[in-house]
Amino acid sequence: LVSYLRRNFPGALYHSVYEAGFSGFWIHDQLREKGIDCIVVNPADVPTKDKERTKKRDPVDCRKLARSLRSGELEGIYVPCRLKLEDRSLIRTRLSMVRKQTRCKNQIKGMLLFYGIHLPEELINSHWSRRFIRWLERIRMEKASGNIALKAHLEELKHLRKIIAALNRAIL
């Protein structure tokens, strides 16, 4: 793209735009490195006609973005640097792992309730302490299949706890 522009339009100022989405900001960064002005816009901020809304296709979207860029109707969003994006990824990953851990704990509690296994009085308020997990590990179901299922949930929980601890250390 850059060589085509420089070959066919030497000395021109190049401007580009794209809608923010799943692909992140790496395209923005690369275009800027090559000397092409680039803005990233919120898709909801792009002026759209009813006809364009009903015929949502790439060629229609491209023309709409080009027309809006040329007329100065677009305002770019803030594009964070790569380091900030990676920090955000770390925080999002931790949040995702905490949600998985919560789901895993709920599955274990559900399994205990399903089989009528009640917590001992001394562990009711222990909130997933080591002692509570040791108690869970000592539970024996009537069949090997039940033991395997419970053990799988407990192993997943321990694995998630290790991951979250490592993420917490990385964040601090």
For the regions a protein language model found, what residue spans apply to each?
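Extended, highly charged alpha-helical segments
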Residues: K64-I108, F114
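A short alpha->loop->secondary-structure connector
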Residues: R32-C38, T54-P59, L112-E121
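Short, basic/hydrophobic alpha-helical segments
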Residues: L1-H15
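Short alpha-helix plus adjacent loop in nuclease-associated cores
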Residues: I39-P80, L85, H127, F132-W135
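Acidic, metal-coordinating catalytic cores used for nucleic-acid/nucleotide bond scission
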Residues: V17-W26
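TOPRIM-like Mg2+-dependent DNA-processing core and adjacent phosphate-binding/basic surface
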Residues: F25-I39, R67
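Glycine-rich, often acidic, oxyanion-interacting loops/wings at catalytic, nucleic-acid
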Residues: R92-L172
